[in-house]
Swiss-Prot record:
This is Sensor histidine kinase MtrB. Its main location: membrane. Residues 536-551 have a biased composition (Polar residues). It catalyses: ATP + protein L-histidine = ADP + protein N-phospho-L-histidine. GO terms for cellular component: plasma membrane. PANTHER family: HYBRID SIGNAL TRANSDUCTION HISTIDINE KINASE C, TWO-COMPONENT HISTIDINE KINASE. Residues 302-519 form the Histidine kinase domain. The gene is mtrB. The keyword Kinase applies. Member of the two-component regulatory system MtrA/MtrB. Seems to function as a membrane-associated protein kinase that phosphorylates MtrA in response to environmental signals.
Length: 562
């Protein structure tokens, strides 16, 4: 029995689970619709405020109406009881031969002969009468009428010689419901004679109920009308705003000819005119910028191609002079070396400009092959390793033991890595540079981390801009052109990969290259974190011991390159 009870409890919770999930889903949907629909919020707010106002007005009006109706009833009751007291006094003092019971009953019958509460539900002033002569010592009380319906609290006022009234619920043979009971002492020969009149409040209750129903019906109709009016009014505002939103979205997608229709001369029309003026200005500026950009790209491409021929001629002449520099005096020999060095830098700049122009023209293509990315890292280290040795900068390399095969353009990937490592050496401030590689099932990532000056907030995007430098006064050991990172991010995008940067002032910077292992795969995650979780001291000797083999390989590369 215990286990079956537990099963029933789980069954109840199990049935409530989908209901709770359904309620949660419904709440989320309503929340989304509420946040996204201005028209719904306007209508709902109008409905809520109107409902609150109607309820408040209904309560006030109903209270005032009830008070007025009862005040009228009380005045009628006071007038009626004054006449009734005169009638009762005359009957009781009339004939001494009648008994007290007979006199009281006769007086009650006389008072109620013209007002029947059972049939006077719709008559104003219908009442029943109660007469009471309290007992004195052994003598019992003498009464006439439904004395048990008179509240004791009201009788206390009458016994004290005061006229008073009270609202109470009565139950008699002909009536059951709320009633006004008014009482007064009499000045007859019978001592302490109490007179009470019971006025049913059926008519007044029916009047108040009718008014409440009418007000409720009218309030509902008014709510519907106000909500409809709010819907129509808000629609007059929301429709142009939605139209402007759709046109703005299409404008952002490149449809520069989209404009808002102008109707009338109201605020919405002025909004449409202002929007169209803004769109026209933006369209004109965008067109001009596109023309300037095309002209700039065409100029860069043309100049780069035109400079190739004279540069080749100058290069041949410079190489010829350099080959015979041993026959020259030291001054001319030094000038020859400077000329060859500057020609190398100029040729690098020209090649970068040509590469940028290819990316701008959309004609850059990949020459994909399956290669071991560890070899790409080692090749890049071999090309720029001499810069680190000349500056006394330690390169810490951490790569997987197994091969990391990826379908990439080896030339472009090696250029990316070479640019990242050279950039880290330039900004490391003689502190070590850490290169890490990791791979998962779909992607491979390489991070280049330095502990130098770092990046200020917002510069992690600017570093990939063309010719941008965080500190123009800083000397570049690598002799870069200012286009390396701009070309690198274009090469990464060409592989459908990512090249991202992170940095903090005084904490250094980290560049992360993430590439798909298979061509065409979309990169969504990276095996390596962007922001370093742990930042060990870059001067730790243990790191140098762990990566001694890699540094030895780097030195061998540097020796072979010489």
């Amino acid at each position: 029995m215990i286990f079956s009870s537990r099963r029933r409890i789980r069954g109840r919770w199990g049935r409530s689970g989908p209901m709770m999930r359904g309620m949660g889903a419904l709440t989320r949907v309503v929340g989304v619709v509420w946040r996204r629909s201005l028209q719904l919020r306007v209508v709902a707010l109008t409905f809520g405020l109107s409902l609150a106002v109607i309820l408040a007005l209904g309560f006030v009006l109903t209270s005032q109406l009830t008070s007025r109706v009862l005040d009228v009833k009380v005045r009628v009751a006071i007038e009626q009881i004054e006449r009734a007291r005169t009638t009762v006094t005359g009957i009781v003092n009339g004939e001494e031969t009648r008994s007290l019971d007979s006199s009281l009953q006769l007086a009650r019958n006389t008072l109620t002969s013209k007002t029947d509460p059972t049939s006077g539900a719709g008559l104003v002033g219908a009442f029943d009468a109660v007469l009471i002569v309290p007992g004195d010592g052994p003598r019992t009380a003498t009464t006439a009428g439904p004395v048990d319906q008179v509240p004791n609290s009201l009788r206390g006022f009458i016994k004290a010689g005061q006229a008073a009234y009270q609202y109470a619920t009565v139950h008699t043979e002909g009536f059951s419901g709320p009633a006004l009971i008014i009482g007064t002492p009499t000045s007859s020969q019978v001592t302490n004679l109490e007179l009470y009149l019971i006025f049913p409040l059926k008519n007044e209750q029916a009047t108040v109920t009718l008014v409440r129903g009418t007000m409720a019906t009218g309030g509902m109709v008014l709510l519907v009308l106000l909500s409809g009016i709010a819907l129509l009014v808000s629609r007059q505002v929301v429709v142009p705003v939605r139209s402007a939103s759709r046109i703005a979205e299409r404008f952002a997608e490149g449809h520069l000819s989209e404009r808002m229709p102008v109707r009338g001369e109201d605020d919405m029309a002025r909004l449409a005119v202002s929007f169209n003026d803004m769109a026209e200005s933006l369209s004109r500026q965008i067109t001009q910028l596109e023309e300037f950009g095309n002209l700039q790209r065409r100029f860069t491409s043309d100049v780069s191609h035109e400079l190739r021929t004279p540069l080749t001629t100058v290069r041949m002449a410079a190489d010829l002079i350099y080959d015979h520099s041993s026959d020259l005096d030291p001054t001319l020999r030094r000038s020859t070396e400077l000329m060859v060095s500057e020609l190398d830098r100029f040729e690098t700049l020209l090649n970068d400009l040509l590469e940028i122009s290819r990316h701008d023209a959309g004609v850059a293509e990949l020459s994909v092959e399956a290669v071991d990315l560890r070899v790409m890292v080692n090749n890049a280290l071999g090309n720029v390793g001499h810069l680190a040795e000349e500056a006394g900068i330690e390169l810490l390399v951490d790569m997987p033991v197994d091969e990391v095969i990826a379908e990439v353009d080896a030339r472009r990937v090696e250029r990316i890595l070479r640019n990242l490592i050279a950039n880290a050496i330039d900004h490391s401030e003689h502190k070590p540079v850490r290169i890490r590689m990791a791979a998962d099932e779909d992607t491979v990532a390489v991070t280049v981390r330095d502990y130098g000056i770092g990046l200020r907030p917002g510069e992690e995007k600017l570093v990939f801009s063309r010719f941008w430098r965080s500190d123009p006064s800083r000397v570049r050991r690598s002799g870069g052109t200012g286009l390396g990172l701009a070309i690198s991010i274009e090469d990464a995008r060409l592989h459908q990969g990512r090249l991202e940067a992170w940095g903090e002032p005084g904490q250094g910077a980290c560049f992360r290259l993430t590439l798909p292992l298979v061509r065409g795969h979309k990169v969504t995650t990276s095996p390596l974190p962007m922001k370093p979780i742990l930042q060990p001291s870059p001067q730790a000797s243990t790191a140098g011991q762990q990566h001694g083999t890699q540094r030895q390989r780097l030195r061998e590369h540097a020796e072979r390159s010489r």
